[in-house]
Amino acid sequence: WRATASVGTAFRAPTLYHRFSEYGVATLRPESSRNAEVALRYAQGNSTFSATLFRNRVSNLISFGGAGTCASSFGCYANTARAEYKGVTFAGSHRVGDVQLHGSIDLQRPRDLDTGKQLARRAKQHATFGADTRLAGWTVGAEVQASGRRFDTVANTTVLGGYTLVNLYASTRIARDYTLLARIDNLADKDYQLARTYATAGRTVYVGVKWAPQ
């Protein structure tokens, strides 16, 4: 067993898009945050497990809100004065024969501390589960990604449904410093949205070569 704890601070300035696009507001203030987490980790043989409690408090969180002072009637970027993310992450892995299993679950409460409402476009639940193995010189695997529903607006009036995606991947070393990579994301060509009216990628195939000099 191993226990760890950490605290930290962060700062993020608004981008040019946040300030000067159709949805931008030139007077946006930068974000600042304070983060704290406590974790407990276990490793034994072919198994690992961890549980991490976290809390992140953000001042002037930059997020997309309703109609405001920008040029768009659809909505504008705005600062949320006081926001908080807190929750727990469970992660683990286990080898069964030649198969490596792994997964993680995030349970969080993203909320506006002034209104008590859920932060826009942030889901409360996320999970990833996968498995991979060696087959004929290749590392091949599959993973499932799932997310709970989220609200598109700060008023929590427009709901974006949850989704589940299946991805496949494979890789093999073709030379000392080169690895051939292939991946299919969103195998079932699932339609889903992270922001209303904005499309996400359908089934996507990637092929590439990774160079890692040794």
PLM region descriptions:
Residues 14-22, 29, 63-74, 106-112, ...:
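Flexible, solvent-exposed coil segments and beta strand-coil junctions
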Residues 5, 26, 36-38, 78, ...:
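Membrane-embedded beta-strands of outer-membrane beta-barrel proteins
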Residues 57-59, 146-153, 168-214:
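C-terminal beta-signal and adjacent terminal beta-strands/loops
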Residues 48-49, 54-58, 75-153, 173, ...:
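Gram-negative outer-membrane beta-barrel transporters
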Residues 9-59, 66-96, 120-124, 159-161:
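Outer-membrane beta-barrel signature, preferentially recognizing the C-terminal barrel domain
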Residues 147, 158-165:
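Outer-membrane beta-barrel transmembrane domain signature
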Residues 10, 115-119, 155, 160, ...:
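Solvent-exposed loop/turn segments connecting transmembrane beta-strands
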